[in-house]
């Protein structure tokens, strides 16, 4: 697809604001954590070596792995771990055991995204507000309250949508990158030889001289690639070219200049290690810089929150979470959604993280394990995509991914050292969500097996009913059923208690597929069952927005004309009764039952009109 120059500029500006906000604010804390750890003495060789490791980490992980390789593995134009998981699992669908392992690995990686979603806003906003301590130590007692206030404001505005202020994200982030580049250049001018650190010689020399220290500091160096996954996750919003142009033309140069500027500052003044980013600025610029940094971290956090909403919706459609209330904050953009449960759940957990760890340095200990695990999983899934989906030779697939796997593994192993210092926190969050997802998936499988075992064949049932047909009333009845070709419980209850049948009857089954989008040309499958009854299958991808009434509008002219005023939707509202020996542990059955009970109603999730829905309940033992 060709992109015009004006469109490319607009998309590149948008990508800078949304895709690179997170990695752009890593300059606030990455260098401080590496040199502030006390593991690295302040010598010119060591500073050059660390800066070189920073530069080549950005080059290998971001420029080569994500921007060059991973961006190519799009799923119908979409990116992100779920899109790659769907692509990888489809490529090995003839290997069911391997497919199940990949699904579990991919879903676990998705769960770790939520752990990262807690740490990243906390460490970003906290590190920005900590700049006040550089202005005056008297501000120290205000850092945590101000951080919590900023975070509360950020989460509170989510329900109102960000369409109005979102247009400012790109320009503000461009100003941020320009600012950090200028700060870096000013310091490099005082010590220009620091630019020699671009040579990989300095990184390799440092690793050769201090292998143990090198391994330890990788756990802090990984902070410089926070948000690298966003490059791939936002592929569908901006496209490959704008993301690549933004990285190579703006983001990478600005980050390099700032990191090298901080290195130059430390060579001139090792005491600046307490907060090298803010100490690069002149005194008169400190307060404005704190304000700009706070804005930049809020924008970075906003992108992550929006990502959490989007990922949760995708996971729900793939059947790994129960339905949650989804509100559309922009009638023109279906992708702009708000999930109250996810929003306030994230907020409470982030507040907990801030209160537990209390500083960006302590939070840095919690960061890394979840992200590095996701990086490893992305590399593994990429191998299966290029091997089994693209059909590349095995040697080429191994060559393309093994190098990145070794690099990712080195960072992951180093971050394991931080497990008991805080790394447990995102793992605990991700592990808890993984248990919820797997329990829901297994519970739904058991429930569907039970429904299938007790199901009545729809065609046979209709033949029997119309031997002595019930009273027909005007209008259309839409019965939602999990399994196509079976009689929905709602219809059985309707016939039993009301003893009537509508003039038109649609038996609707929703199928969610492991592809991002399904267009309208493949949305509906319709089969006439006679007696003014139809079987309708509605197909959605995991990025589609389920809307049953809108989908059924396309049935007009195909044998059945719908009138919104005379259409009723019949749903079954099942109550789960856990039993012993069903295939899941008793505690998981109870957990599934509670999740099922608290799930948002199908009517809201499928956008059914409130005044046209009839819910009929039943109890099901599993």
UniProtKB/Swiss-Prot annotation:
Pfam families: K_trans, K_trans_C. One of its GO terms (cellular component) is plasma membrane. It catalyses: K(+)(in) + H(+)(in) = K(+)(out) + H(+)(out). It is a multi-pass membrane protein. Its main location: membrane. GO terms for molecular function: potassium ion transmembrane transporter activity; symporter activity. It comes from the Bacteria. Keywords: Cell inner membrane, Cell membrane, Ion transport, Membrane, Potassium, Potassium transport, Symport, Transmembrane, Transmembrane helix, Transport. The chain crosses the membrane at residues 11-31, 50-70, 101-121, 137-157, 168-188, 215-235, 247-267, 285-305, 337-357, 366-386, 393-413, 419-439. It is found in: Cell inner membrane. Belongs to the HAK/KUP transporter (TC 2.A.72) family. Transport of potassium into the cell. Likely operates as a K(+):H(+) symporter. This is Probable potassium transport system protein Kup 1.
């Amino acid at each position: 697809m060709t992109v015009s120059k004006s469109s490319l500029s607009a998309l590149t500006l948008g990508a800078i604001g949304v895709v690179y906000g997170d990695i752009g604010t890593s300059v606030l804390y990455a260098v401080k954590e590496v040199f502030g750890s006390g593991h690295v003495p302040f010598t010119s060789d060591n500073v050059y070596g660390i800066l070189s490791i920073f530069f080549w980490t950005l080059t290998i992980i971001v420029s080569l792995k994500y921007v060059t390789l991973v961006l190519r593995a799009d799923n119908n134009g979409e990116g992100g771990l779920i899109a790659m998981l769907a692509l990888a699992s489809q490529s090995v669908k003839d290997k069911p055991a391997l497919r199940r392992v990949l699904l579990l690995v991919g879903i676990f990686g998705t769960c770790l995204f939520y752990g990262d979603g807690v740490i990243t806003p906390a460490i970003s906003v906290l590190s920005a507000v900590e700049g006040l301590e550089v202005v005056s130590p008297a501000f120290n007692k205000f850092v945590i309250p101000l951080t919590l206030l900023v975070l509360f404001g950020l989460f509170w505005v989510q329900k109102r949508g960000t369409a109005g202020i979102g247009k400012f994200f790109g320009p503000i982030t461009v100003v941020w990158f320009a600012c950090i580049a200028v700060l870096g250049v000013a310091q490099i001018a005082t010590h220009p030889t620091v630019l020699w650190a671009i040579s990989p010689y300095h990184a390799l020399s440092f690793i050769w001289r201090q292998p143990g220290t090198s391994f330890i500091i990788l756990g802090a160096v990984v902070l410089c690639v926070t948000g690298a996954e966003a490059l791939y996750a936002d592929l569908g919003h901006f496209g490959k070219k704008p993301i690549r142009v933004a990285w190579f033309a703006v983001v990478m140069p600005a980050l390099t200049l700032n990191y090298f500027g901080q290195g130059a500052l430390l060579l001139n003044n090792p005491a600046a290690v307490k907060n090298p980013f803010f100490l690069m600025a002149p005194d008169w610029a400190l307060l404005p810089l704190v304000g700009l940094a706070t804005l930049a971290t809020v924008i970075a956090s906003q992108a992550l929150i929006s990502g959490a909403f989007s990922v949760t919706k995708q996971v729900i459609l793939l059947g790994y979470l129960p339905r949650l209330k989804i509100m559309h904050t922009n009638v023109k953009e279906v992708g702009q959604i708000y999930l109250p449960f996810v929003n306030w759940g994230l907020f409470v957990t982030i507040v907990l993280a801030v209160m537990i760890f209390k500083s960006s340095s302590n939070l840095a200990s919690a960061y890394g394990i979840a992200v590095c695990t996701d990086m490893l999983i992305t590399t593994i899934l990429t191998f299966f995509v290029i091997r089994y989906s693209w059909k590349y030779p095995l040697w080429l697939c191994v060559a393309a991914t093994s190098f990145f796997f070794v690099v990712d593994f080195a960072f992951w192993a180093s971050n394991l050292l931080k497990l008991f210092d805080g790394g447990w926190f995102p793992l605990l969050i991700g592990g808890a969500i993984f248990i919820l997802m797997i329990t829901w998936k297994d519970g739904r499988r058991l429930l569907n097996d039970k429904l299938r075992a007790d199901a009545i064949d729809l065609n046979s049932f209709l033949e029997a009913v119309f031997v002595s047909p019930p009273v027909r009333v005007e209008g259309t009845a839409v019965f939602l059923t999990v399994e196509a070709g079976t009689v929905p419980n709602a219809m059985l209850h309707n016939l039993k208690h009301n003893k009537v049948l509508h003039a038109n009857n649609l038996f609707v089954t929703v199928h969610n597929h492991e592809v991002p989008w399904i267009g309208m040309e493949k949305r509906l499958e319709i089969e006439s069952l006679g007696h003014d009854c139809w079987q309708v299958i509605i197909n959605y991808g995991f990025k589609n927005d389920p809307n049953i009434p809108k989908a059924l509008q396309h049935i007009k002219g195909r044998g059945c004309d719908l009138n919104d005023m005379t259409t009723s939707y019949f749903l079954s509202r099942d109550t789960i009764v856990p039993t012993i020996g069903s295939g899941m542990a008793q505690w998981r059955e109870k957990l599934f039952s509670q999740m099922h009970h608290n799930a948002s109603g199908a009517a809201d999730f499928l956008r059914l009109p409130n005044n046209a829905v009839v819910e009929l309940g039943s109890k099901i033992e599993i």
